[in-house]
């Protein structure tokens, strides 16, 4: 399987894991739908060439009432662009709430900035080989 995980936030990104050769690649969140499509198209092409299924898991996000309107709009636009590209390429996907995947790493700090730092630290430890390259 080729598994793709997407954090659609402004400072988010994408990770692609190829199960057959354990190849893992990471990308910062692209700024355009063209760049998004290019990354996902390459993943889909790999799945075709290697006769492997592909699945995308995208973080199911929403704006909070305390978010600035322009930031919330941009956040929603980015999420929608990802969904549009995934749909246009006919890639199967699931939406995963942050609380669902964060349970695996509990307990995490309550304060958002501290929580993000801790999650980044965990990811760095898990994917240390990739981060060092």
What are these regions (language model features)?
Residues 1-133:
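Phosphate- and other anionic-substrate recognition elements at nucleic-acid/protein interfaces
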């Amino acid at each position: 399987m080729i598994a793709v995980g997407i954090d659609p936030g402004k400072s988010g990104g994408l990770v692609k894991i190829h199960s057959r050769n354990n190849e893992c690649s990471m990308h910062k969140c692209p700024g355009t739908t063209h760049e998004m499509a290019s990354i996902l198209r390459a993943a889909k092409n790999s799945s075709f060439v290697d006769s492997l299924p592909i699945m995308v898991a995208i973080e199911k996000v929403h704006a909070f009432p305390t978010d600035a309107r322009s930031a919330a709009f941009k956040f929603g636009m980015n999420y929608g662009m990802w969904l549009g590209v995934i749909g246009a390429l006919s890639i199967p996907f699931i939406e995963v709430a942050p609380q669902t995947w964060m349970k695996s790493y509990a307990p995490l700090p309550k304060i958002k900035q501290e929580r993000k730092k801790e999650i980044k630290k965990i990811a760095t430890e898990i994917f240390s080989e990739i981060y060092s390259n």
